[in-house]
Amino acid sequence: MAYRKLGRTSSQRKAMLRDLTTDLLINESIVTTEARAKEIRKTVEKMITLGKRGDLHARRQAAAFVRNEIASENYDEATDKYTSTSALQKLFNEIAPRYAERNGGYTRILKTEPRRGDAAPMAIIELV
């Protein structure tokens, strides 16, 4: 089998992977279980590769997977308005150019101590 089931149905698993991938793109580092970290590594690598391509088709493919969440919000005093950046905009405008010269290997998984409640192996996954 080429993927982990993670104890969920396929729709639940896909939703969880979309959420974790979006969170990683926004925060650039998250703490999760080791199995989930290894699984979202695949999707994050694909999204960054799409971001590096940068064409319209790649943008639409990434938009179909990444959640429409606000990555950052800034206040402009001159115009008295808030400007927000979505996770998709951050992927294409900030993250992808950072890895323009890198061929894969955009994430790093660091193992940490087990979770206190159930001793599940935990890991920190972050963008390199």
Swiss-Prot record:
Presence of the UniProt keyword Ribosomal protein in the record: yes
UniProt keyword Ribonucleoprotein, yes or no: yes
Gene Ontology CC entries for this record: cytosolic large ribosomal subunit
Record Pfam families: Ribosomal_L17
InterPro entries for the chain: Ribosomal_bL17 (IPR000456), Ribosomal_bL17_CS (IPR047859), Ribosomal_bL17_sf (IPR036373)
One term of GO molecular function: structural constituent of ribosome
GO biological process terms on file: translation
Subunit structure: Part of the 50S ribosomal subunit. Contacts protein L32.
Family to which the UniProt record says this protein belongs: Belongs to the bacterial ribosomal protein bL17 family.
Full protein name: Large ribosomal subunit protein bL17
Protein's organism: Streptococcus uberis (strain ATCC BAA-854 / 0140J)
Gene that this polypeptide is encoded by: rplQ
